């Protein structure tokens, strides 16, 4: 179970041009979001109660789906996207259409396909659009590369279901 610390805060890092979640003096989670993507550049902004709850909700929803080592990082990316990132432009034309109906529950994982496929975390929805955080890098239909952690907005008919291998072996 993830435990939050009241000292955690959001900080924009000029050196890296990235938003980070500062966990301690020596540990932080760097997001994929640069200054041009942010609505504000926070300076030592403590996690508010809503953000802390979202962080816990995302981590809990992904437990057993992602390795424990990735839970906090992915949850922080999602909360940062919802709290600080400008609304992305719809990019459905850069992804393949999916004829398979996919569940679009928030905090669930699906796939997007361009020239390559990538798993995404659904973070916001306004029918027929959905905002997703990429969980792995991918190449779009136009050849452009997107890195893990980026926020994309697509029509729901671009999402594909994802099949997960169990993270834990069954024992007799």
What is each stretch, according to the model?
Residues 149-164:
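Structured surface patches comprising rigid loops and adjacent beta-strands/short helices at the edges
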Residues 1-117, 139-148, 164-172:
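Mixed-charge, low-complexity intrinsically disordered regions
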Residues 6-7, 122, 130-131, 154-156:
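N-terminal, helix-rich and Lys/Arg-enriched segments in bacterial and organellar proteins
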């Amino acid at each position: 179970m993830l435990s939050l610390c009241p000292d955690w805060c959001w900080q924009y890092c000029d050196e890296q041009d990235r938003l980070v979640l500062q966990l301690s003096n020596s540990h932080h989670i760097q997001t994929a979001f640069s200054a041009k993507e942010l609505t504000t550049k926070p300076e030592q902004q403590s996690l508010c109660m809503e953000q802390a709850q979202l962080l816990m909700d995302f981590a809990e929803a992904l437990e057993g789906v992602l390795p424990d080592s990735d839970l906090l990082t992915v949850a922080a990316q999602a909360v940062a996207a919802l709290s600080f990132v400008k609304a992305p432009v719809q990019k459905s034309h850069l992804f393949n259409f999916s004829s398979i109906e996919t569940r679009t529950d928030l905090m669930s994982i699906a796939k997007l396909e361009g020239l390559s496929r990538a798993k995404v975390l659904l973070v916001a929805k306004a029918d027929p659009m959905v905002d997703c955080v990429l969980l792995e890098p991918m190449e779009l239909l136009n050849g452009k590369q997107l890195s893990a952690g980026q926020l994309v907005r697509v029509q729901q008919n671009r999402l594909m279901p994802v099949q997960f291998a169990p993270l834990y072996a069954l024992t007799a």
